[in-house]
Amino acid sequence: MNAIRTGSRRVVHLELHTGDQVRAGAFYAELLQWRPELVRAGSGCYLAVDLGPAVGGGIIECQTRRPLWLPYAEVERIDDATEHARRLGAAVLLEPREGPSGWRSVVSSPVAGEVALWQPKR
């Protein structure tokens, strides 16, 4: 448990979940001069956006009642952090899952919103 609380966990990625990826990408391109880059991912597409040197970003199309930004916070051990969130009363929306560059899970609290937990491969 101490490993989970050894300092602040930084946000390393922001991802917009939306029902209209094309229009959302165009909105942010016009508003903030972001230049979304189309990345093929499995059977879908992902719009990667450059948010600066410290934070990655993207826009993903999915079924959602309303668009929402999902922050990814880096953790040391994905399984421990996910279980810690569960003990704090969060619902686990996505159990820890491995991807090409790390592991992620998504947790939700009725009072604190949703956050993705991220453990990069080293």
Language model: regions and residue ranges:
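Amphipathic alpha-helical segments
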Residues: D20-R35
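Conserved active-site tyrosine of GNAT-family acetyltransferases
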Residues: A24-Y28, A85, A112
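Conserved short beta-strand elements that form part of the metal-binding/catalytic scaffold
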Residues: W34-L68, V107, E114-P120
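Vicinal oxygen chelate
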Residues: V11-G19, C62-L88, W103-S108
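N-terminal beta-strand motif that seeds the catalytic metal site of vicinal oxygen chelate
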Residues: M1-V22, W69-P71, W118-R122
